[in-house]
Amino acid sequence: MAYSWQTEPNRTEPQEDGSDTQQFHHTNQHLSSRQVRLGFDQLVEEINNKTPLSESEKEEDTYFVPDAPNLGSKWPSIYETHPRYFSEFTSQSPDSSQLRFGKLSAIGFNPAVLPTHQLIHEGASWRNPSGKYHGIEYPRFDALPPSSTGQGECNPQGQSGTKHHNYCGEHEGNLPHHHSSYSIDSIPNREKRRSGDVNLVEPSLEFSKDSFLPRTSENVSVESTEPIGCPIEIVEVPQGSNKNLASFCNKVKKIRESYHASDINSNSGKIWAITTAYPSRLFADTKFRVKISIDNSAQLLLLMPHANYLVKDLIAEILLLCANEPLSPKEYLLSVCGSEEFLQMDHSLGSHKIFQKNKSVIQLHLQKNRDTPGKLSRKSEDDHSPFHLNQLLEFTHIWKISRQCLSTVMKKYNLHVEHLLKPQKDMEEKHLSSMVSGNQHTSQPHVNNVLEEVKNICSVLGCIETKQVSDAVKELNLILQRPSQNFHQNSETSKKGFIERVTAELSRSIYQLIDVYCSSFCTDFQPVHTPGGVSHVHAGLQSHLSFTVCSLHNVPETWAHSYKAFSFSCWLTYAGKKLCQVKSCRPLPVTKSFSLLVNWNEIINFPLEIKSLPRESMLVIKLFGIDSATHSTNLLAWTCLPLFPRQESVLGSRLFSVTLQSEPPIEMIAPGVWDGSQPSPLTLQIDFPDAGWEYLKPESEENRTDHEEPPRECLKHIAKLSQKKSPLLLSEEKRRYLWFYRLYCNNENSSLPLVLGSAPGWDEETVSEMHAILRRWTFSHPWEALGLLTSRFPDQDIREVAVQQLDTLLTDELLDCLPQLVQAVKFEWNLESPLVELLPRRPLQSIRVAHCLYWLLRDAQGEAYFKSWYQELLAALQFCAGEALNEELSKEQKLVKLLGDIGEKVKSASDPQRKDVLKKEIGSLEEFFKDIKTCHLPLNPALCIKGIDRDACSYFTSNASPLKITFINANPMGKNISVIFKAGDDLRQDMLALQIIQVMDNAWLQEGLDMQMITYGCLSTGRAQGFIEMVPDAVTLAKIHLHSGLIGPLKENTIKKWFSQHNHLKEDYEKALRNFFYSCAGWCVVTFILGVCDRHNDNIMLTKSGHMFHIDFGKFLGHAQTFGGIKRDRAPFIFTSEMEYFITEGGKNIQHFQDFVELCCRAYNIVRKHSQLILSLLEMMLHAGLPELRGIEDLKYVHNNLRPQDTDLEATSHFTKKIKESLECFPVKLNNLIHTLAQMPALSLAKPAPQTLLQESCILNKTRTIQRVTILGFSKTHSNLYLMEVTCSDNRRSLTKKSFEQFYRLHSQMQKQFSSLALPEFPHWWHLPFTDSDHKRIRDLSHYVEQVLRGSYEVANSDCVLSFFLSEHIQPTLEDSPFVDPGENSLDKSPKVQLLMTYEDSRLTILVKHLKNIHLPDGSVPSAHVEIYLLPHPSEVRRKKTKCVPKCTDPTYNEIVVYDEVLGLQGHVLMLIVKSKTVFVGAVNIQLCSVPLNEEKWYPLGNSII
């Protein structure tokens, strides 16, 4: 990757000694885990354990440092404080300095190249994690040369530091400057004497050749620390102390400022009806029936506008009809009665979904004040409200720090420090101490108080105790324990000076702890300081990544008892792939101080050059514990962080919270997967090098656009590979091939996600080439960019281009992919990315988008990861939405909470008590509406509700016991609204399935095909809870089967009979038949593509108007339930013989089945054109945590069902096979039977008997008395059906047919219903042999019917009798059939064959579609197959044949016949012969030169072979 190192102006580059540094690097790199070099802190601990403080050697090491305590560093190391002396020292002792400081001598800094004193001192102690303070017992810090010359050499910086850092100058006089006379040259020799042959190297200074030089940290920079006596002040930071979140707040504020509340276009406050793009031919001749109500008028206006009529034109027409004076249409709006939804002025009526789905009379309301903002609009006060993220976030973290709490503790600390440093005389005068006798213990009580407050400060800050704090505490205690004789001549003064210095260092370490805490975590406070700059040092792009893992803070006591040691491992990852091998550290036990912690101080060096690291690289760290009993290593926690946030590297010391979740999701590792900036019980401290670098975009080569024309075979292969649609579905070899020919790819033969996803890596050259392709690519549609927001593309530039494309989508189009965009946030690099900016901005323009996004973000917070980012994004949305909308959303949230509590109580109650529990809990909902008056329905923001219909509420008897809740519509012109509230079921998968189905339906509508689909609303409102829209007048297929008797699922006329009972008029029946025809075809396609499983008659619903739809998508993508290894769902989709029976009207209109197959295949091929979009939508949900969508195999399943690589002919043939396979699958009926039997006991308790259906459904006018019924004849082909003519009292006649069994069931029904009345005797079912039984039965039945109709008036006019004779009427002709056979006259009875032929690349492809009106010579029904001969044909095999369709006069094949090596059509004849087994049925010869290619055509069949 390209990185730019920032250096100070006019800085000279030092010379490096390659041989020395190489030698040191070699030594450092080959250390094993047991040979990791010790730091000085461990050396001091060893010395302290062996040598008492009173030994003379310790006394010799006593020294003083001529450094004012107000300088912003702790007791600095030699080279930090006096660079020139260090330079001199290194020149005198090159060998020892090389061993001690490694990289430093190689770089060879001199004062001219060092940064300013502020940068030298700020945070220096943090970059010295293993160092000790200057004190009498620490031999590593030797005194500086005492000469005045030496001091003078550091005066420029020292004076500058004194000048700029002296906040409390009156105390400066109390700081004596002492100089030690100990020789600096003896340091290496003494270290060698004490440690043997081991080179002891300070971890924070130990760097290999290619590691970073330690510098100061940006986030812990303190340009000046507090001198003695100056308190540490904490100030409020409303925008947040974390610069990332503060920057996010500013970004969101700018977004809202760009949309003023006074802008009526973006802030209308109204909910606009959803529109979709559709071809005008879809409703070319359609007119809608519209009823218009007008303010201050009780009269309704009935109009029939054309579908292509614009809404504003309709308003103008209404005003023209009703107004007495000319009115401007611009001042009016049309709303949908019963809701708060408004039609969009510049759109046609037909483009509104409400008109597309609702074919009945639509009621609209005309109202004025178009320019008046709605009740949900933003107010001017909202424009001036500040955005403080901490006020909106609802974090539930354990360590939520209060500014007041920390300020209180800090005041106590400052007070005790002040008391400690007061002169003895002042202490006596103010009576602040009663323990003033004796030199040894005078200050001890105050020291104890100070240390207690230090402990409290650390406790408030998440029990974080840095090494600097610990060392300062130890130093303070040790100085007080030091005998007076060990100090200089003036013991009191000397000791006082040391106490002042140590307390100053303690304050400084606390200050730095607070500063680093505030910069690492999100707080609303920070310490008072002047921010300093950052030193960017050029260490070379060949440098290796290096950092120090310091310590783990606040280790739980249970861990300390259970685990004997702790270790960590770390690695780098990018786009879900590891970039390097895992690095591990040595295990160390827990140490005890103020709290339990583990001090590793482990330097990690990755053998990766800076320039080779992708910009979006992530560091993952896992923490392990070694079990004390089993000695096994257990994963305890983990965290992750970006290496280059905000285009720059991580600098200095940082604190990171860790999560206790089991395993890090490798494929989802991104900055938001675990927000380390949010405090948690465990905190990890990591010290990064203070050298920084900036990322620069690599320059791409644009001169490669001119290339030679690719070979034709190459283009064909590219197009073939591009049919995979997703790079996840391409093998490594195919991705290499596609990338090799990337310059030949364009939007006509490929897609951009596929091309960029085939890149071999993310090195600088490859990324440069990817960006070049990105710039010159032309998107075919914004939907194509969706694939660039998946987890495979972490590159920020690529994602930015994708968002730019998606931002061009219309508002209603954006709703179709909003759930995926919420998921795509997971893989953004920060909260200022273009996608995160788009999500709060688009809701400013649409209430519907804001409402949808709110509930998506609410639901997303229940996911295991990324919760913090979603909370912050939700806070931004609420800030932008304004007070009015937020109040409504708050009401909805309270409603959801109430329903969730009720659902849990009903579910947990016993079966007999559930009804009483529900009635009792409904009262809480009534109280809720008394308080808030009205509330919008979370399922649909356009619906406003004001109460509960108590009597209409109930619950379902399924496992989750979902509630049926009926709300009272707040709109007086609207009906009550019934919904299902589920508690205990995850509805996110249902939402996704319905979303994809809606996308398919939109694709059909855009192609002019209305499949009469019902896609009900579904909304997940949290963990395992949500709303489901109830479709009015819908009933499950199981209930229909149940009312047909025990074996209802096995009967073929069940569905037809039910529709006949509910649609007595001919036009109603035909409408229901048409709706079923289209909706059944649509659901066959969508359930096949999505692999919807667990299909049975309880998951299929029907409406009286004929619409069929599926519910419950808990099992999809082929994840079928199994019993004993056998799948329950063995059919590709649900299409049974009873559905075919209804479509073909009992087998009388077989051509309707052909039309059904044609419709299914057409719908299937339309959806296949949108395979890229469907697969992208699914791929973006792979990491949403859905139970059935988790991996590549699930995508492959949908891809295999879409078959984008097939031609339309091949896909047609494939889907036709699936239709036949489903039709012949008997286990489907068996499964329905099992479900029906399982529900019979439950339903029998609730409802008496099957006749209830007749009583409810067949409510006919009793004045329509049947005058007579005449049996005209019978047919043996369909179970001895008797054809009857029914004459009613109004002389209307109709035909119907019934079987003897149906007559018997009618008689049994009447016996049960009229048990007290005398009924005529029913004819016997048996007859003597050798008699004309059929004609005799006609006479018996005629006599029986006559007695029934002339008998009791109550019986003759009962619902069951009227329904029996007046339902299932027969249409005398097919002239008014709702099915249209394109290009054919249905009255033509001549035999025909339908073919479709294509010719390309010497290949002749023939699709044999259908045969029509074929019979055997004796008139019987054939079992036909088709034989095809190509004459002449060069190969020996000339004959090709289709499969046989048994016993059918209008068989459907949709089989493909292919002839290769056909060099031309001229001179070729296609001979087609139809046979039934070996019997000739018909034939035709076709001259291929005259055939219209790529068109369907019917060819007449002759009765002989020519």
From Swiss-Prot:
Record protein name field: Phosphatidylinositol 3-kinase C2 domain-containing subunit gamma
Tissue-specific expression: Expressed predominantly in liver. Also found in kidney, lung and lymphoid tissue. Down-regulated in BeF3 cells expressing the BCR-ABL oncogene p185.
Coiled coil: none
Family statement drawn from the similarity comment of this UniProt entry: Belongs to the PI3/PI4-kinase family.
Protein species of origin: Mus musculus
One of the GO BP terms on file: chemotaxis
Membrane topology of the entry: Peripheral membrane protein
Stated role: Generates phosphatidylinositol 3-phosphate (PtdIns3P) and phosphatidylinositol 3,4-bisphosphate (PtdIns(3,4)P2) that act as second messengers. May play a role in SDF1A-stimulated chemotaxis.
Localization per record: Membrane
Pfam families on file: C2, PI3_PI4_kinase, PI3K_C2, PI3Ka, PX
UniProt xrefs under SMART domains: C2, PI3K_C2, PI3Ka, PI3Kc, PX
Catalytic activity: a 1,2-diacyl-sn-glycero-3-phospho-(1D-myo-inositol 4-phosphate) + ATP = a 1,2-diacyl-sn-glycero-3-phospho-(1D-myo-inositol-3,4-bisphosphate) + ADP + H(+); a 1,2-diacyl-sn-glycero-3-phospho-(1D-myo-inositol) + ATP = a 1,2-diacyl-sn-glycero-3-phospho-(1D-myo-inositol-3-phosphate) + ADP + H(+)
Region listing for Catalytic loop, in residue ranges: 1091-1099
GO cellular component: membrane
Superkingdom per UniProt: Eukaryota
PROSITE patterns registered for this protein in UniProt: C2, C2_PI3K, PI3_4_KINASE_1, PI3_4_KINASE_2, PI3_4_KINASE_3, PI3K_RBD, PIK_HELICAL, PX
Residue segments, region Activation loop: 1110-1136
PANTHER family: PHOSPHATIDYLINOSITOL 3-KINASE C2 DOMAIN-CONTAINING SUBUNIT GAMMA (PTHR10048:SF29), PHOSPHATIDYLINOSITOL KINASE (PTHR10048)
Compositional bias segments (type: Polar residues): 20-34
Primary residence: membrane
Key words of the record: ATP-binding, Chemotaxis, Kinase, Lipid metabolism, Membrane, Nucleotide-binding, Transferase
Gene: Pik3c2g
